[in-house]
């Protein structure tokens, strides 16, 4: 693996069973030295092909490499240049020359083919989850988790977890929680994560007297218990800038699903692939419509049996479709390493 450096990388690298080379540059950019560096390392280890992630901008070195290359597509990094004159032509050339395309979902797969102007040899390998780490909590574990996070044991908890940026839709969730508070005094919207939108969201919650608690950034080791102590998980992601900004997939939906928690999602990008509408949760076509969000939350909070069924289906889907061992096999088949 050739990648960029970060603080503490040496400790991580030492614990991995494969070779990791790190550049001096904080960001990998497509320039002639990078081409030479990749070619030299590939020759040294006897590689048959190169996998480049992300496709933009780093993937632009692909056509200059001496070996075949595969590209990994996530979403926005293809959507924006795919709609800009000049950039689209360069991107299309890079995509068409690739041996294979690995897309994180149907949305980036479609964006790649739109940019290329033709079908591509694409395999969808979505974001995955460790189902042993992210698992449903027992009753006692759920009680302990709520106590750990300072959440009342009898609260109806709607959890949101993500970077706090406008397209994640937490403002709509806050507005919905404020309405629901009138009829559901035990409701609590818990928002975890950090980002530039936090100040605005806190002001909105105060103005509306909404039942919201901001946890800030939560350590990775605490995430399974945070998901597991919620009744519903939500991220009302929405499109912005005429569709140039969308949700690529939504790993948080899959993590919540693996914990057996039903999800309420906004229909943006790949979110509707991560959440099976009517099966593992609810996908809202207009995630800025507050009443639609209120209705979705009410549907799940009013029906314990429905919530339990969706939670069970969520867990099963996480095991069958999103577990790392399942996706590793799919990726290996796509790359031809099992041939």
Regions found by a protein language model. Give the residues of each.
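A short, active-site helix/loop in glycosyltransferases that binds the activated sugar's phosphate group
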Residues: 97-124, 129-136
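A short helix/loop element that forms part of the nucleotide-sugar donor recognition site in Leloir-type
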Residues: 135-151
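Short His-centered aromatic/hydrophobic patch
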Residues: 52-58
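N-terminal strand-loop element at the rim of the active site
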Residues: 1-29, 108
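Nucleotide-activated donor-binding/catalytic signature segment of Leloir-type glycosyltransferases, i.e.
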Residues: 199-224, 232
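Conserved donor-binding/catalytic core segment of Leloir-type glycosyltransferases
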Residues: 102, 152-168, 174-178
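Acidic donor-binding loop of glycosyltransferase active sites
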Residues: 99, 228-246, 261
């Amino acid at each position: 693996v050739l990648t960029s450096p970060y603080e503490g990388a040496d400790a991580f690298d030492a614990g991995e069973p494969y070779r990791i080379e790190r550049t001096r540059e904080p960001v990998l950019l497509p320039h002639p030295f990078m081409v030479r560096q990749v070619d030299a390392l590939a020759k040294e280890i006897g590689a048959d092909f190169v996998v480049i992630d992300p496709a933009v901008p780093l993937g632009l070195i692909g056509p200059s490499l001496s070996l075949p290359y595969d590209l990994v597509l996530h979403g926005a990094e293809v959507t924006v240049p795919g709609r800009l004159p000049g950039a689209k032509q360069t991107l299309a050339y890079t995509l068409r020359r690739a041996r294979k395309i690995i897309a994180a979902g149907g949305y980036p797969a479609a964006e790649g083919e739109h940019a290329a102007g033709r079908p591509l040899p694409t395999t969808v390998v979505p974001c995955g989850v460790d189902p042993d780490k992210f698992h449903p909590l027992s009753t006692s574990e759920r009680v302990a988790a709520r106590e750990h996070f300072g959440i009342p044991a009898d609260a109806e908890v709607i959890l949101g977890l993500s970077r706090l940026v406008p397209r994640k839709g937490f403002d709509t969730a806050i507005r919905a929680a404020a309405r629901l508070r009138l009829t559901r005094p035990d409701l609590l919207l818990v928002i975890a994560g950090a980002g530039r939108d936090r100040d605005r969201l806190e002001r909105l919650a105060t103005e509306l007297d909404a039942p919201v608690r901001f946890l800030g950034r939560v350590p990775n080791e605490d995430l399974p218990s945070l998901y597991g102590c919620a009744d519903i998980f939500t991220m009302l992601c929405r499109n912005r800038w005429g569709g140039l900004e969308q949700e690529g997939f939504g790993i948080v939906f899959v993590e919540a699903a693996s914990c057996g928690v039903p999800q309420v999602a906004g229909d943006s990008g790949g979110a509707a692939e991560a959440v099976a509408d009517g099966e593992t949760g609810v996908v809202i076509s207009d995630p800025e419509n507050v009443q639609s969000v209120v209705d979705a939350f009410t549907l799940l909070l009013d029906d314990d049996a429905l919530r339990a069924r969706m939670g069970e289906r969520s867990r099963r889907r996480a095991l069958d479709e999103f577990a790392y061992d399942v996706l590793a096999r799919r990726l290996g088949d796509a790359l031809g390493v099992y041939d």
